[in-house]
Amino acid sequence: MSQKVTPFMQSLKSLPADYRFDGSPVSDRLENSSGASVRLTNSNVPRKGGLRNGVSRTDTAAGDSEDSPYSGHGVFVEEQSLTDDVDSGAATMPLPQSDERRWSDTSAYARKKILQSWIQLPNGNWELGKILSTSGEESVISLPEGKVIKVISETLVPANPDILDGVDDLMQLSYLNEPSVLYNLNYRYNQDMIYTKAGPVLVAVNPFKEVPLYGNRYIEAYRKKSNESPHVYAIADTAIREMIRDEVNQSIIISGESGAGKTETAKIAMQYLAALGGGSGIEYEILKTNPILEAFGNAKTLRNDNSSRFGKLIEIHFSESGKISGAQIQTFLLEKSRVVQCAEGERSYHIFYQLCAGASPALREKLNLTSAHEYKYLGQSNCYSINGVDDAERFHTVKEALDIVHVSKEDQESVFAMLAAVLWLGNVSFTVIDNENHVEPVADESLSTVAKLIGCNINELTLTLSKRNMRVRNDTIVQKLTLPQAIDARDALAKSIYSCLFDWLVEQINKSLAVGKRRTGRSISILDIYGFESFDKNSFEQFCINYANERLQQHFNRHLFKLEQEEYIQDGIDWTRVDFEDNQNCLSLFEKKPLGLLSLLDEESTFPNGTDLTLANKLKQHLQSNSCFRGDKGKLFTVVHYAGEVTYETTGFLEKNRDLLHSDSIQLLSSCSCLLPQAFASSMLIQSEKPVVGPLYKAGGADSQRLSVATKFKSQLFQLMQRLGNTTPHFIRCIKPNNIQSPGVYEQGLVLQQLRCCGVLEVVRISRSGFPTRMSHQKFSRRYGFLLVENIADRDPLSVSVAILHQFNILPEMYQVGYTKLFFRTGQIGVLEDTRNRTLHGILRVQSSFRGYQARCLLKELKRGISILQSFVRGEKIRKEFAELRRRHKAAATIQSQVKSKIARIQYKGIADASVVIQSAIRGWLVRRCSGDIGWLKSGGAKTNELGEVLVKASVLSELQRRVLKAEAALREKEEENDILQQRLQQYENRWSEYETKMKSMEEIWQKQMRSLQSSLSIAKKSLAVEDSARNSDASVNASDATDWDSSSNQFRSQTSNGVGSRLQPMSAGLSVIGRLAEEFEQRAQVFGDDAKFLVEVKSGQVEANLDPDRELRRLKQMFETWKKDYGGRLRETKLILSKLGSEESSGSMEKVKRKWWGRRNSTRY
């Protein structure tokens, strides 16, 4: 395929046209490179005024810049004066107005510029310089800092013009070589444009900082195709659109070395898929699995603060409408050794530090947690924190995520208990018990805490860590363990618990995200697997990780190189083969049977006496002839990977490959009371019963042995590759710009080494010179055949396809027709897709307009029919309502007539009865007036004529009328009198109630007075009794004294005794009067009380009596007042008499008694 080359391009034929990543020239000459660049640039250079997404920059490397006809998605070249005197008079060129001028302006622009080339400095970095002169095999180069050096012309690498600085697709570079790619990525990296396309591959440079490229605004822009710059969102959008359009499962394969940003890139892709396919709520659960998996599967290493120590494949399932219906997570090769051993400056898994920092006081007390530096497993690396990371906050995030994926609170506490048990296991120490260095665990806090957390007996735990039961035939031998053996047993138990816990968590997450009956077969798989690793000391983990990367690189090569070129050849496409670095030899070194690395490793693992040294010797013996293997001294050997040489040390290879946990430890876990250890034991028993699939070795091999770690991992990789092989892959290559994890630092050597590993240059070359878009004749004709103007019903698919291409003026060099497919260069199918979409959109608008017209017509017809139907229905309804009203009116009229007739009959009967009464009264009166003279009545009172009629005199009739009027007047008077009497009766009833109230109050007052009189009387009785006793005592004393004073005078004694007797007689009479007064008081009180009670009963109607209770009550009150006055007078008289009797006595004490008594009496008197 020939193409015209511009004069300027012809002048550059003497320079090396293109370079591979190793810097050597290749057979792909300048014509192909420049020609391709011209065509691609033609589709991207805008017309004048068409700059968009521009940024301002100053090119310090070149030293000058001018207005450029190139816009290039994110580049804006600002005019600046030249710093040197070369070509100082160059004028700026205006932007072209047509396609021809556009290319002519580009050529003129290039001719005006001094040629620029890349030169490699002694430190390995590339520097941009200007070619001042060329003589023979040497050239004079001017460097940016002003130095002028002379170099060999063959070492120079052509540089792209500055108008191509920062292009977003490496396919647009005119010169495709290492320094140009490095410079372009560096330019974009400094502008925070971290994504660059390399053909079908997205190159993502880790910025080590937050960049404003994410969020809902960007998601919406990529969903609507309003932003076409390279991005993870664009890759995810392409995947989901192709899945729906082609009904083929998709995969997004993210690769790169540790610290390149693979985990974050995977999360960004999941974020976009969740935004586009969300709505059911399951997408939120899928996103929340990331904190859980990172906490339990990621750790800080020397190269990465958040390094994934396991591989994962997240398969997101979609419904037919493109909505997420579920997901499934598959994990690979968790680095269990990190649980018990960490290198200096690294950390174990994040969850341990998060638990120690963020556990609540109640949880800390329950798990007996302490700070992280007190656990030996965590303290051996002397690294407990990560700059800028709050472990306590991350722990709460993990707990929230566990809630979202439906892990119960009880299960969460069990998970944390297992983590604490692992930490405390590391603190279990041993003591020597005999001369043979046998040990047993120290019975301290660590041992008891472990037993408590996993729910086992402490004695069983002690036996498991210090002894081992071995079955020999039918006998059981108990072997005591030495210190190294006991430590290995302890660490193996800790690693197994953590590994099983990680698998259990993944299983719980998968249950929460299960698709179930909603599965449709459509899915997008996101692979985030550990990157290529090479350390100062590489062990079994790096061996497996790098093997996985070799397998992924082979998958990458197969899809982008092998299958691509094989398809071109099979379909008869005119194609120039592109060479690429194939890693099949290295992959065969690992997988070849029976003399591959994995086979020899498994074979040595089956030998009881096999050691790490015997393994190294065996590898050197059988693999020394392989070009990818080199045996070193001792336990070292080197493998030449696609990414570079890695030296491994076989120390620990056999132990880690066997991954044996003794049956005693499994039995211990199965005997625990907690559910999780029991589940772990069941899982390990199931795994231990699985034999090796197929005879890996010769007779006497490992058919009955447990699957080794390497074999299991190889099987998982084969299944993974098979699953990815059934999908359409989308590749993202993550690049780590520096090893210090600092933003803004760009290390050329490190980036270049990763680009070489990724094969980016080969990908761009094959994509630029190839046909990335292909479609079968049948599918192409079905998809775009309706765009043809002429009828194509009777034509074959190939003729239809060719007719479509001619109709839309697709240039012949932009496509090729194969035996079964059409092959298009980049961007060509997009033109047809745009036309198809516009046509379909127009068809849809026409259809919608026509369907709208049909719908409106139908609606009008329906409205008319509905109106008619409504009128009929409403008429029928009104007629029924009218008939009902007539029936109700007729029924009402009938009821009214019946009621009125009933009332009339009742009135008539009343009038008739009244008439009879009046007639009887009048007749009686007439009879009484006649004094029984009936004859007069018969003869004179009335006469009968011949016809039998009664004749009444006029005088009699007038008399009767007068009497009737009089009777009526009397009746009215009686009625008025009756009304007056009723009013008076009502007044009497009111007065009666008032009188009854007054009577009750008077009765209460009277009762109080009676009680007062009774109390006064009782006091008087008591006082008189006291005075009587006092007088008697005084009389006896006086008599004795008189006797003693003058015992000889009888006359005196006689007078004394007579005086006492005379005084005692009136006192006795006074007591009798008082007694009668008391009896009278009691009698009267009884009488008055009975009378009052009787009147109350009469008043209340309980007793019938022919008397007026009010008048009788007033009379009774008058009688009580009269008696009271009389009784009071008699009491006063009695007092005076008693006072006179008391005055005749000379004793002062009696007077005091009397005054006291009468004072009480007066105070209590009413």
Swiss-Prot record:
User: Which residue stretches, if any, does this entry annotate as coiled coil?
Assistant: 955-1005
Q: Which UniProt keywords apply?
A: Actin-binding, ATP-binding, Calmodulin-binding, Cell junction, Coiled coil, Cytoplasm, Cytoskeleton, Endocytosis, Endoplasmic reticulum, Endosome, Motor protein, Myosin, Nucleotide-binding, Phosphoprotein, Repeat
InterPro entries to which the protein is assigned, alphabetical:
IQ_motif_EF-hand-BS (IPR000048), Kinesin_motor_dom_sf (IPR036961), Myosin_head_motor_dom-like (IPR001609), Myosin_N (IPR004009), MYSc_Myo8 (IPR036022), P-loop_NTPase (IPR027417)
Q: Which residues form the IQ domain?
A: 839-868, 862-891, 888-917, 911-940
The UniProt transmembrane annotation reads none
Q: Where is this region: Actin-binding?
A: 589-623, 717-739
Myosin N-terminal SH3-like domain span = 112-161
Compartmental location? Cell junction, Plasmodesma; Cytoplasm, Cytoskeleton, Phragmoplast; Endosome; Endoplasmic reticulum
Bias (Polar residues) ranges: 1-13, 32-45, 1032-1060
Residues where Phosphoserine is found: S14
Query: One MF term from GO for this chain?
Result: calmodulin binding
Give GO cellular component annotations, separated by semicolons. endoplasmic reticulum; endosome; myosin complex; phragmoplast; plasmodesma
Q: Residues in domain Myosin motor? A: 165-837
Q: Name one GO biological process term.
A: actin filament-based movement
Family, per entry: Belongs to the TRAFAC class myosin-kinesin ATPase superfamily. Myosin family. Plant myosin class VIII subfamily.
Domain note for this entry? IQ domain mediates interaction with calmodulin.
Q: What is this protein called?
A: Myosin-1
